[in-house]
C-alpha cells in the first residue's frame, strides 16, 4: 500500500510560498532524489499549473534543473480539479469523490506518493489519508501568505528531523 506524504517549504511564521522560499542547491538535490523515488504525485489545480513549468526544457536550465524536470515528467500525476478539462503528459484528472479516488490510488500502488498543495493537503488530512508531513523550514519570515496547514492543525508526532545544507531543517511528522 502506498503512503501519502505532504511536504512543502515553509517560512518560520508558517507560510508556504515557492517564490519566496526557493530551494537552495542542497535542498534542491534532496528534492530531486525524492522525486525520483516517488511513485507519483497528487496535485491541486493551482500547484499543478505552476509545476507545468517543468514540462518543457528551458535553455537556461543547469544539470540539476534538467534532472528534476526528468524526474517530474516520469512520475504519474493525479490532478484534483473540477475546472480543468485536460491535463498534460503522464497526468490524470480526479474530478469526483476525492476520498474514493485516493483510497484506490493508495491501495493500487506501493511506495511514496507526494501530495502537492496546502488546500488539497487540508482536505486529505480531514479524510485521514495523509501518512506523513514534511516541513522544510527556512530561516525567513514572510508575514503573510498561504499557511502550510490550510485549516486546523492535526495532532501530529515528530518522528525525525535533519538539517539540509546550512539553513533548512526538515521536520517529519506522522498523525498522532
Would you name each region that the model predicts?
Residues 1-176:
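Enzymes that bind and transform nitrogen-containing heteroaromatic metabolites
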